[in-house]
């Protein structure tokens, strides 16, 4: 296997914008976690090579807890890139690059909640299809 870098896509980091946690009942071992991840893309005005992924993540077992999180990932495209490659970067690569940071945040947060949830390690997510594009304001 050959491993290389992708010089045309730069990841500039993730910011956690909002976290809402609600404990409903004492945690038990029979927790059945449901994860919903909804990424959207935003292209800032007058910055042709910049895009952002807004990711809403819900993790819950409605019997015990609900965790809602919103994060934003910052990305930059370098050079002349064909439209099909740009589309793949935006719709597949960027959310896949960003998600492990969000996942890690959730694990760290729940580890520090004590016995409220136990430490949650949510499964990896796979991204396919076109992201909803948020309007430029």
Go through the PLM ranges and name each one:
Residues 1-97, 104-137:
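N-terminal intrinsically disordered, cationic/polar leader segments
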């Amino acid at each position: 296997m050959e491993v290389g870098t992708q010089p045309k896509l730069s990841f500039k980091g993730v910011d956690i914008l909002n976290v809402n946690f609600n404990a409903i009942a004492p945690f038990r071992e029979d927790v059945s976690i449901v994860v919903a991840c909804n990424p959207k893309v935003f292209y800032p005005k007058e910055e042709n090579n910049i895009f952002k992924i807004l990711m809403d993540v819900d993790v819950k077992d409605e019997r015990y807890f609900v965790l809602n999180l919103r994060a934003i990932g910052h990305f930059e495209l370098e050079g002349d890139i064909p439209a099909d490659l740009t589309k793949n970067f935006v719709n597949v690569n960027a959310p896949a690059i960003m998600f492990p940071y969000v996942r890690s945040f959730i694990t760290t947060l729940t580890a520090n909640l004590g016995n409220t949830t136990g430490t949650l390690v949510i499964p990896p997510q796979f991204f396919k299809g076109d992201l909803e594009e948020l309007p430029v304001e």
